[in-house]
Amino acid sequence: MYAYFRGRLVSCLPEEAVLEVSGIAYRFLVSAGTARQLPEVGTETILYTHLSVREDALQLYGFATEEEKQLFRLLLLTSGVGPKLALAVLSGMAVPEVHEAILANAPERLFGITGVGRKTAARIILELRDKILKLAPVGSAVASVAADRGGFREDAVNALMTLGFPRPVANQAVGCALEPEPDASLEVVIKRALATMHNR
């Protein structure tokens, strides 16, 4: 509904900012990273915006960059991740760091974030890896993390191990999942591997 708000920064705290636009003060929840990037109080600035609509409330979320807003919205697509947890991820890590953790299949990098456990980290990686890769410009540092297909099988095995499956079982299931379509995406391979194990 809203792309961004431009106005005078009235106040800025670690978790929220107030922006005055045409005489109306809007309260935004922000990540720690956005709070650090905002200018001095009284200065005109822009906050890229996401509006969360619930039955009992409307809440604005503000972001210093379009990239952070985009990642926030992607995180909301992950099963079990709501606005509060998505904002916690962005407060705990910079956008490029989250991208790299997802593409490198490194859930341990997400564990230190408040509210992100082993299974949540695994779901974030499983459900967002292909989406993040599509957004990365060809030749960028982010894209290069996932460019090596040699580590693709190991990424899938590690993701299943993160979900609690033993390595031999995960390795065999990934092998079966790759047989019909060796170039399938990581998300597809893991879903097929999970289906294989559940059907046994």
Swiss-Prot record:
Q: Which HAMAP family does the entry mention?
A: DNA_HJ_migration_RuvA
Which keywords does UniProt give here? Answer: Cytoplasm, DNA damage, DNA recombination, DNA repair, DNA-binding
Name the protein family.
Answer: Belongs to the RuvA family.
Sorted alphabetically, which SUPFAM superfamilies does this protein's record hold? DNA helicase RuvA subunit, C-terminal domain, Nucleic acid-binding proteins, RuvA domain 2-like
Role, per record: The RuvA-RuvB-RuvC complex processes Holliday junction (HJ) DNA during genetic recombination and DNA repair, while the RuvA-RuvB complex plays an important role in the rescue of blocked DNA replication forks via replication fork reversal (RFR). RuvA specifically binds to HJ cruciform DNA, conferring on it an open structure. The RuvB hexamer acts as an ATP-dependent pump, pulling dsDNA into and through the RuvAB complex. HJ branch migration allows RuvC to scan DNA until it finds its consensus sequence, where it cleaves and resolves the cruciform DNA.
Task: Spell out the InterPro entries in the cross-references.
Answer: DNA_helicase_Holl-junc_RuvA_I, NA-bd_OB-fold, RuvA, RuvA_2-like, RuvA_C, RuvA_C_sf
Instruction: Give compartment(s).
Output: Cytoplasm
**What is said about its interaction partners and assembly?**
Homotetramer. Forms an RuvA(8)-RuvB(12)-Holliday junction (HJ) complex. HJ DNA is sandwiched between 2 RuvA tetramers; dsDNA enters through RuvA and exits via RuvB. An RuvB hexamer assembles on each DNA strand where it exits the tetramer. Each RuvB hexamer is contacted by two RuvA subunits (via domain III) on 2 adjacent RuvB subunits; this complex drives branch migration. In the full resolvosome a probable DNA-RuvA(4)-RuvB(12)-RuvC(2) complex forms which resolves the HJ.
Gene Ontology cellular-component terms listed: cytoplasm; Holliday junction helicase complex; Holliday junction resolvase complex
A Pfam family cross-referenced in the UniProt record is: RuvA_C
Domain III as annotated region, ranges? 154-200
Could you state one GO biological process linked to this protein?
Answer: DNA repair
Q: Which domain of life is it from?
A: Bacteria
Q: Which GO terms describe its molecular function?
A: ATP binding; four-way junction DNA binding; four-way junction helicase activity
Q: Where is this region: Domain I?
A: 1-64
Which stretches does the entry tag as region Domain II? 65-143
Kindly give the Gene3D superfamilies that the UniProt entry links to this protein: 5' to 3' exonuclease, C-terminal subdomain, DNA helicase RuvA subunit, C-terminal domain, Nucleic acid-binding proteins
Q: What is this protein called?
A: Holliday junction branch migration complex subunit RuvA
Q: From which organism does this entry originate? A: Chlorobium phaeovibrioides (strain DSM 265 / 1930)
Domain commentary: Has three domains with a flexible linker between the domains II and III and assumes an 'L' shape. Domain III is highly mobile and contacts RuvB.
- Looking at the record, which segments are called Flexible linker? 144-154
